[in-house]
Amino acid sequence: MLQTARQDQEVLVEMRNAGVHRSGRWLVRGVDLTVRRGEIVTLIGPNGSGKSTTVKMAIGVLQPDEGAVRRMPSLKVGYVPQKVSIDWTLPLSVERLMALTGTLDRKKVGEALEAAGIAHLARAEVQTLSGGEFQRALLARALAREPDLLVLDEPVQGVDFTGEIALYQLISEIRDRTGCGVLLISHDLHVVMAATDTVICLNGHICCRGTPEKVLKSPEYVRLFGARAGDTLAIYHHHHDHTHLADGRVRQADGTIVDDCHAHHHDHARDGGQGGGGHGHAG
């Protein structure tokens, strides 16, 4: 088989110039994004930047009003939502949580709980779980469906820093073991997974993209968070060659002001030392 054919077969989702228009405005526009099997792509950006809209287009919940989205035939998606509506006053075990959205094979449930590191909590009430344990339960529920693409919407919300490290490490291990693609929304603009292959910064459009840089392994950092933290979390240095004004217009690097930067080219810095406009963020 030709190499190009193999590469095309590995593509799970491909978006080209995709956008969603609602109530007279673009929620997000001009999105080019590809997720391949075994690849981790992380979306970052402020609230309202179009991260969730982009994910919904990727998995087919929303159809693009312009551009195109192509998915692998019979693509299986495992989805961990940002919020789950649960009546916390009712008794609900982790096992029952796993089957809330459909019947699952008991063996697959057990394997998924084992993979998420919470097999010992199968009969525990969800009300008693910590933030990290609950996120692992949601992750296990997605894994039980043996997805080709794992979609994680802010998977470390409500989790302390140590828990973030453990969850990101788990996500990386799941990718390595199953070969699934991962599309992840990060709640933090500055700290992303070191294992991420591509970081895409959104603000109604793609501002910039690149690979994350590992957190500096200073003695102080290792002392505070442990040696593994530097291998799991990374700082993504990026720069913008334009400025978003309060009225929604955009000031370009040469001083000209335009209505939007949809068609404007954005330089991407893979190294924080490139370009005078680079900003280093340290979580």
UniProtKB/Swiss-Prot annotation:
Name of the encoding gene: znuC
Biological-process GO terms, alphabetical: response to zinc ion
Main location: membrane
Segments of this protein annotated with the region Disordered: 264-283
Compartments (UniProt record): Cell inner membrane
Comp. bias intervals (Gly residues): 272-283
Record's GO cellular component terms: plasma membrane
Subunit: The complex is composed of two ATP-binding proteins (ZnuC), two transmembrane proteins (ZnuB) and a solute-binding protein (ZnuA).
Keyword Ion transport: yes
Binding site for ATP: G45, P46, N47, G48, S49, G50, K51, S52
PANTHER family: METAL TRANSPORT SYSTEM ATP-BINDING PROTEIN TM_0124-RELATED (PTHR42734), ZINC IMPORT ATP-BINDING PROTEIN ZNUC (PTHR42734:SF9)
Function comment: Part of the ABC transporter complex ZnuABC involved in zinc import. Responsible for energy coupling to the transport system.
Enzyme Commission identifier(s): 7.2.2.20
Keyword terms of this UniProt record: ATP-binding, Cell inner membrane, Cell membrane, Ion transport, Membrane, Nucleotide-binding, Translocase, Transport, Zinc, Zinc transport
PROSITE patterns reported for this sequence: ABC_TRANSPORTER_1 (PS00211), ABC_TRANSPORTER_2 (PS50893), ZNUC (PS51298)
Organism of origin: Chelativorans sp. (strain BNC1)
Enzyme class: translocase
SMART domains: AAA
Residues in ABC transporter domain copies: 13-228
InterPro entries the record matches: AAA+_ATPase, ABC_transporter-like_ATP-bd, ABC_transporter-like_CS, Metal_Ion_Import_ABC, P-loop_NTPase
Keyword Flavoprotein among record annotations: no
Topology in the lipid bilayer: Peripheral membrane protein
Name recorded for this polypeptide: Zinc import ATP-binding protein ZnuC
Family: Belongs to the ABC transporter superfamily. Zinc importer (TC 3.A.1.15.5) family.
Reaction equations catalysed: Zn(2+)(out) + ATP(in) + H2O(in) = Zn(2+)(in) + ADP(in) + phosphate(in) + H(+)(in)
